[in-house]
Regions:
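Secretory-pathway/luminal and periplasmic proteins that interact with or process carbohydrate-rich
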Residues: 132-133, 194-201, 261-267
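Divalent metal-coordination and catalytic microenvironments
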Residues: 108, 170, 237, 322
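Catalytic glutamate of the conserved HExxH
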Residues: 163-167, 171-175
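A hydrophobic membrane-anchoring feature enriched in long, contiguous, low-charge segments
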Residues: 46, 81-84, 185, 189, ...
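Hydrophobic or amphipathic, alpha-helical segments that drive membrane association/targeting
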Residues: 1-138, 145, 338-340, 344, ...
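Cytosolic-facing loops and C-terminal tails of multi-pass membrane proteins
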Residues: 1-20, 207-230, 239, 243, ...
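Catalytic Zn2+-binding segment of zinc metalloproteases
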Residues: 172-187
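Short pre-active-site segment immediately N-terminal to the catalytic Zn-binding motif
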Residues: 150-166, 225-228
């Protein structure tokens, strides 16, 4: 399916959802059931074929074609079982226990009780500027779910406690009530199909070819048909967040995350990597990140970053709506918030152990980036040496060398 057809199907699902929400959900459930029916049908066909062939061979009837049938039935059975029992990797990061961060787990429990949501089974702390709840299928396509919450250390550094709790309420909002359970079931189903589609990409043989043909037809249509449901779920999660913490707090969290995550990507990381010019060994970023994220971003940068964020339209590449649409749905002002105060930092939810986790992620970052840092240090050394050479001969430089010198200085100052 090409992109134009996919977008067309997404728009049809959005219109269907707007015209008749219950009817749309029934159609989504029916299309999901079609995938289940295909898996069960393949499982029964392969099992029946295996039983028939083995029974025939046990009664002395042997034909060369039986070998091919055994291989085909075995391949189909294996593919069906893979579809029923997809295995997912655990989230990256460090698993937190209630004893590590009592205040965090108490806050999660309060949110759970207020929205009457299911329990979070495992909580992970990672290095992303994000928070997310993922529900991995416990039994593949056929039910069960393990709820994982991933919390980014930079996010804890950037927000005060109320705004961070608004983010947690948004994430927990994905699991609330009957609609949440239906959306979570569709989400788990989508994950299972996506993994099966990925795992079978390079398989060969007639059984794999038939399975791939079905997936090429079914999976993009399933993704398009469920897109409106996933988009609705984001707005509903925002609504839950606004209801629990207040619309102003939820909106301020969205805006502050948009601006500060942009600042980290465009300003902090380039500046941090420039330290490789003077430092041969990698330097952990999170101690300095903590101090800088506790400050207000530069005014000009913040205003321009917000303008850019508000210009981004909601498209089919991401089920998350754009910032403008999310703020409008919350009926909130599209302006810069008062920045989070470091005296009420969400990092305090980790308790006295926050310094330990910062040191842990600094050490891990240095380990993961040691080779790249070494190469960057050597590269900046060559740039600096060449810049010094051209600076010494500046009066004799050609126009091309002057342009080269300007480019080298820009790289050193980046």
């Amino acid at each position: 399916m090409d992109r134009a057809d996919f977008i067309h199907l997404v728009r049809l699902s959005e219109h269907a959802s707007a015209d008749d929400s219950k009817g749309y959900r029934r159609s989504v459930a029916a299309f999901a059931a079609l995938g289940y029916a295909w898996v069960v049908g393949c499982l029964l066909l392969s099992a029946g074929l295996l039983v028939w062939v083995v029974n025939a061979m046990l009664h002395g009837r042997f034909k060369a074609v039986f070998i091919g049938l055994l291989v085909a039935a075995g391949g189909l059975l294996w593919t069906s079982l893979k579809a029923l029992w997809c295995r997912f990797d655990e989230p990256e990061g460090v698993e937190l226990q209630a004893g590590d961060a009592p205040a965090l787990f108490e806050s999660l429990e309060r949110i759970r009780k207020k929205i009457k949501g299911p329990p979070i089974h495992r909580v992970f702390l990672d290095a992303d500027f994000n928070a997310s709840i993922r529900q991995h299928p416990r039994y593949g396509l056929f039910g069960g779910g393990v709820n994982y919450l991933s919390i980014g250390l930079p996010l804890l550094m950037a927000l005060d406690r109320p705004r961070f709790l608004a983010v947690l309420a948004h994430e927990y909002g994905h699991l609330r009530g009957d609609h949440g359970r239906f959306a979570a079931w569709i989400y788990r189903t989508r994950l299972s199909w996506a993994m099966l589609n990925h795992d079978l990409r390079h398989d060969e043989g007639p059984v794999a070819a038939a399975t791939q043909a079905f997936l090429r037809w079914y999976f993009p249509r399933f993704s398009a048909k469920t897109f409106a449901l996933a988009r609705q779920d984001e707005y509903e999660a925002d609504r839950i967040s606004g209801k629990l913490l207040g619309k102003d707090v939820a909106a301020a969290a969205l805006t502050e995350i948009a601006v500060k995550s942009d600042w980290v990507a465009r300003e902090f990381w380039p500046d941090h990597w420039s330290a490789a010019s003077a430092q041969a060994l990698p330097v952990g970023p999170y101690v300095s990140m903590r101090a800088l994220l506790g400050l207000a971003p530069p005014g000009d940068f913040a205003r321009e970053s917000l303008r850019q964020a508000l210009r981004r339209i909601s498209d089919v590449d991401d089920t998350h709506p754009g910032l403008r649409d999310r703020l409008e749905a919350l009926e909130a002002a599209k302006c810069l918030p008062a920045w989070s105060s470091s005296s009420r930092s969400a990092l305090d939810l980790l308790g006295p152990g926050s310094a330990k986790w910062i040191a842990h992620f600094d050490k891990q970052w240095c380990k993961d980036n040691a080779s790249d840092w070494k190469q960057h240090h050597a590269y900046l050394g060559r740039v600096r040496a060449r810049a010094a050479e051209l600076t010494a001969s500046e009066r004799r430089n050609s126009a091309e060398e002057m342009v080269e010198l300007g480019n080298l200085k820009r790289r050193l100052n980046a």
